[in-house]
From Swiss-Prot:
Database matches in PANTHER family: PROTEIN/NUCLEIC ACID DEGLYCASE DJ-1-RELATED, PROTEIN_NUCLEIC ACID DEGLYCASE 1
Residues annotated as catalytic: C190 (nucleophile)
Location in or out of the cell: Cytoplasm
Regions of compositional bias (Polar residues) in chain numbering: 1-12
GO CC annotations on file: cytoplasm
Keywords (A to Z) from UniProt: Cytoplasm, DNA damage, DNA repair, Hydrolase, Stress response
Protein name: Protein/nucleic acid deglycase HchA
Similarity remark: Belongs to the peptidase C56 family. HchA subfamily.
InterPro entries linked to this entry: Class_I_gatase-like (IPR029062), DJ-1/PfpI (IPR002818), HchA (IPR017283), Prot/Nucl_acid_deglycase (IPR050325)
EC number: 3.1.2.-, 3.5.1.-, 3.5.1.124
Keyword Disulfide bond: no
Organism for this UniProt entry: Staphylococcus aureus (strain bovine RF122 / ET3-1)
Biological processes per GO annotation: DNA repair; methylglyoxal catabolic process to D-lactate via S-lactoyl-glutathione; protein repair
Length: 292
């Protein structure tokens, strides 16, 4: 007989690889993860055939988030938030390049991997080599960005690791500047919009001021995520709060799978938005190609 979910521990699980570090509790994983996603098929399989346009994904390379209480949360990019949108993009015909800030391997929250979801697992296996040997973002900026770049979109997946480094990176700022100046898409979800904070780094005003976004609700990181042991403590800062201070408009205060398009910025509120955000990105990119 399977264990009753209410008997599962709400205490975060120690990560023995690091001092005072913790994975989410068994109970929180029973609430937040599942063996399958809501993937319901690809809408535009093979629709893009020219081979020029690609997606640049900026992945997280740091696993640990230091919290207010001195504990560390053992995290990474959320596999559903990364791989399900990319499944839609890759199946439509767009190639994907992976970059991290230093060129170190991307980190994933494998405890959130939907192990029975063929779309996610297939995409993970296709990208595994690139995830382990990504490009260095500074090299991409130097050699592959510019008005004639082959990248049509920049994708920043979520997972709490997105709040480490990516949110205060000059290279991320340069990448976002390039996307805005060259009319390319910026696609991100859940905690990934923390990367948008880099756009306002050392500036009086963010170029994204006035944009509307979906983001993971601060109220969950301050409340339920701690209460059920998903996080082992409070974050030092909150994504939606700081985005609001930079003049962006956060349109959600809950987690429903909502997505939003504001100009070329495409956002989703949580892992629940992964499937629809992938569809939205494909539709918008195909429309942009047709109109070029």
């Amino acid at each position: 007989m399977s264990q009753d979910v209410n008997e599962l521990s709400k205490q975060p699980t120690p990560d023995k690889a690091e001092d005072n570090a913790f994975f989410p509790s068994p109970y929180s994983l029973s609430q937040y993860t599942a063996p399958k996603t809501d993937f319901d098929g690809v809408e535009h399989k093979g629709a893009y055939k020219d081979g020029k346009w690609k997606v640049l994904m900026i992945a997280a390379e740091e696993r640990y988030v230091l919290l207010e209480n001195g504990k560390m949360f053992s995290t990474g990019n959320h596999p559903v938030e990364m791989l399900l949108p990319l499944h839609h993009l890759m199946e439509a015909g767009f190639d994907v390049d992976v970059a991290t800030l230093s060129g170190y391997p991307a980190k994933l929250e494998l405890w959130a991997m939907p192990t029975e979801d063929e779309a996610v697992i297939t995409t993970y296996n296709k990208l595994k080599e690139k995830l382990k040997q990504p490009k260095k973002l500074a090299d991409v900026i130097k050699n592959e960005l510019g008005p004639d770049s082959d990248y049509l979109s920049v994708f920043i997946p979520g997972g709490h690791a997105a709040v480490v480094g990516i949110s205060e990176s000059e290279d991320v700022q340069k990448t976002l500047d390039w996307a805005l100046e060259n009319d390319r898409f910026i696609v991100t979800l859940c905690h990934g919009p923390a990367a948008l904070l880099s756009a306002g780094l050392n500036r009086e005003k963010s170029p994204l001021e006035g944009y509307s976004v979906c983001v993971f609700p601060d109220s969950l990181d301050e409340g339920a995520n701690i209460e059920i042991g998903y996080l082992p403590g409070r974050l030092k800062w909150l994504v939606a709060e700081l985005l609001t201070k930079q003049g962006l408009k956060v349109v959600n205060d809950d987690m429903t799978g909502r997505t939003l398009k504001d100009r070329k910025l495409l956002t989703g509120d949580s892992p629940l938005a992964s499937n629809e955000l992938g569809k939205l990105a494909v539709n918008e990119m195909l429309n942009a190609i047709q109109n070029k």
